[in-house]
Amino acid sequence: MLKLLLLLALSPLASLVHAAPCPVKQRVGIVGGREASESKWPWQVSLRFKFSFWMHFCGGSLIHPQWVLTAAHCVGLHIKSPELFRVQLREQYLYYADQLLTVNRTVVHPHYYTVEDGADIALLELEIPVNVSTHIHPISLPPASETFPSGTSCWVTGWGDIDSDEPLLPPYPLKQVKVPIVENSLCDRKYHTGLYTGDDVPIVQDGMLCAGNTRSDSCQGDSGGPLVCKVKGTWLQAGVVSWGEGCAEANRPGIYTRVTYYLDWIHRYVPQRS
């Protein structure tokens, strides 16, 4: 069985054993990356859970002035109370300029059970729509026809570990790294390397997307954050950080929830922007 590097596979309560205010270990830190420019990634958000303070536990993305997209394993199957969560919009350094927003409701995909089973996707509705500006505005969702072919250069962002067991240090800057898309069938073969499961048992499913290599990858630290790609001059969200084995390890690309696979479900709740 794959050793998943997730502490939030079932519930954000698992994160609360960590000392504050260090970023909590989930999937997605940035390996091989650098600090992001303050003018970039205006859709990036930090999700917070109430502990002794509002602790960062996952990333997310603003996809509409009133909606945030994240991973289902961040929200959990059993925590239904939106008052336990807060959202911090684009922030260069965690905790240094917090203006936390309240959440009206959480919506977890009904088919989610574990990250390996897929459907690792969730929505948070904000109580009040945000004021869109050059510093804060939503990321565009891709058309259903967009495939993000193998080799496409995309970007993943977050506040997580910078390598296996190497946490991001204060002042906790937002990090970014460029990662190549890995075609699903190739990614699946890579994940079968060294395992005894039969090749006919898929690990990487249609609703998943792979990206990364031994030089650049997501790591522990910010599950739920966005994987974005620039297509014909427009930034599109290709994936949601979900899971993986290790950080930038051979034959183990990062695995993301494929946004196009869940567009119909997203738009049951989130109005389409013109």
Swiss-Prot record:
From what organism does this protein derive?
Rattus norvegicus (Rat)
Sorted alphabetically, which CDD domains does this protein's record hold? Tryp_SPc
A Gene Ontology term for the protein's cellular component? extracellular space
| Domain of life where this protein originates | Eukaryota
Q: Pinpoint the Peptidase S1 domain residues.
A: 30-271
Q: Give the family, as the similarity comment puts it.
A: Belongs to the peptidase S1 family. Tryptase subfamily.
Which residues are modified to Phosphotyrosine? Answer: 96
Which proteins does it associate with, and in what oligomeric form?
Answer: Homotetramer. The active tetramer is converted to inactive monomers at neutral and acidic pH in the absence of heparin. Low concentrations of inactive monomers become active monomers at pH 6.0 in the presence of heparin. When the concentration of active monomers is higher, they convert to active monomers and then to active tetramers. These monomers are active and functionally distinct from the tetrameric enzyme. In contrast to the hidden active sites in the tetrameric form, the active site of the monomeric form is accessible for macromolecular proteins and inhibitors, e.g.
Q: Which SMART domains match?
A: Tryp_SPc (SM00020)
BP GO annotations: proteolysis
What molecular function terms (GO) are annotated for this protein?
heparin binding; peptidase activity; serine-type endopeptidase activity
> Where would you find the membrane-spanning parts of this chain?
none
Name this polypeptide is given: Tryptase beta-2
Q: Provide the catalytic activity annotation.
A: Preferential cleavage: Arg-|-Xaa, Lys-|-Xaa, but with more restricted specificity than trypsin
The gene from which this protein is expressed is: Tpsb2
Q: Record's Pfam families?
A: Trypsin
Give the classification, highest ranks: Eukaryota, Metazoa, Chordata, Craniata, Vertebrata
Q: Where is the active site?
A: 73, 120, 223
Q: What are the cysteine partners in each disulfide bond?
A: 58-74, 154-229, 187-210, 219-247
What InterPro entries does the record point to? Peptidase_S1_PA (IPR009003), Peptidase_S1_PA_chymotrypsin (IPR043504), Peptidase_S1A (IPR001314), Trypsin_dom (IPR001254), TRYPSIN_HIS (IPR018114), TRYPSIN_SER (IPR033116)
Keyword terms, alphabetized: Disulfide bond, Glycoprotein, Hydrolase, Phosphoprotein, Protease, Secreted, Serine protease, Signal, Zymogen
Q: Which residues form the pro-region?
A: 20-29
Q: What does this protein do?
A: Tryptase is the major neutral protease present in mast cells and is secreted upon the coupled activation-degranulation response of this cell type. Plays a role in innate immunity.
Localization per record? Secreted
- Which N-terminal residues, if any, form the signal peptide? 1-19
EC assignment:
3.4.21.59
